[in-house]
């Protein structure tokens, strides 16, 4: 059996829906408290972040909604809970900044991606302000116009 290729950037999973639903304002890097079977599953990229978000409670940050699918070979002696709440490791200054921003109306703390930093798993979290439906349409329209512009510039030299 051939080994799977590792991700070139070290990215395990991304939450693309978060970039679509929120204006990202500030990003933070957080460590995670994980069990052994979770790390083995992450090496096999068995992670889903679609509806994950960060809950700030009692001066601590907790990640909810992330789903790690357990490997059948790795978690034989442990009862694996794929959607358990996981503690995020942030310093006190970052926690205060997040708590103050989330108190404001319209702001949410969301998980953008998980990645490897040397041998550690890190979580990129962000403060985001929710987009309205017309904001999403504007973003899509802007992306389409940029694509057309780049296509026109690229094809301009080929018309000779």
Swiss-Prot record:
Family, similarity comment: Belongs to the SmpB family.
Organism, scientific name: Pseudomonas fluorescens (strain SBW25)
Keywords: Cytoplasm, RNA-binding
Top-level lineage group: Bacteria
GO terms for cellular component: cytosol
GO BP, sorted A to Z: trans-translation
Region feature (Disordered): 134-160
Localization terms from the record: Cytoplasm
Pfam families linked to this entry: SmpB (PF01668)
Gene assigned in the entry: smpB
Record PANTHER family: SSRA-BINDING PROTEIN, TMRNA-BINDING COMPONENT OF TRANS-TRANSLATION TAGGING COMPLEX
Protein name according to UniProt: SsrA-binding protein
Role: Required for rescue of stalled ribosomes mediated by trans-translation. Binds to transfer-messenger RNA (tmRNA), required for stable association of tmRNA with ribosomes. tmRNA and SmpB together mimic tRNA shape, replacing the anticodon stem-loop with SmpB. tmRNA is encoded by the ssrA gene; the 2 termini fold to resemble tRNA(Ala) and it encodes a 'tag peptide', a short internal open reading frame. During trans-translation Ala-aminoacylated tmRNA acts like a tRNA, entering the A-site of stalled ribosomes, displacing the stalled mRNA.
Entry-linked InterPro entries: SmpB, SsrA-bd_prot, SsrA-bd_prot_CS
Alphabetized GO MF terms: RNA binding
């Amino acid at each position: 059996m051939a080994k799977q290729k590792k991700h070139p950037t070290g990215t395990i999973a991304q939450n693309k829906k978060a970039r679509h639903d929120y204006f990202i304002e500030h990003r933070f890097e957080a460590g995670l408290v994980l069990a052994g079977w979770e790390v083995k599953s992450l090496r096999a990229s068995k992670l889903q972040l679609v509806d994950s978000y960060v809950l700030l409670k009692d001066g601590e940050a907790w990640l909810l909604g992330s789903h790690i699918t357990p490997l059948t070979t790795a978690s034989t002696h442990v009862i694996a809970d794929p959607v358990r709440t996981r503690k995020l490791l942030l310093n006190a200054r970052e926690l205060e900044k997040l708590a103050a921003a989330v108190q404001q109306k319209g702001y949410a703390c969301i998980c953008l991606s998980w990645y490897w930093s040397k041998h550690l798993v890190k979580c990129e979290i962000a403060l985001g302000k929710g987009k309205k439906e017309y904001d999403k349409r504007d973003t899509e329209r802007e992306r389409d116009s940029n694509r057309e512009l780049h296509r026109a510039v690229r094809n301009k030299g080929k018309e000779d």
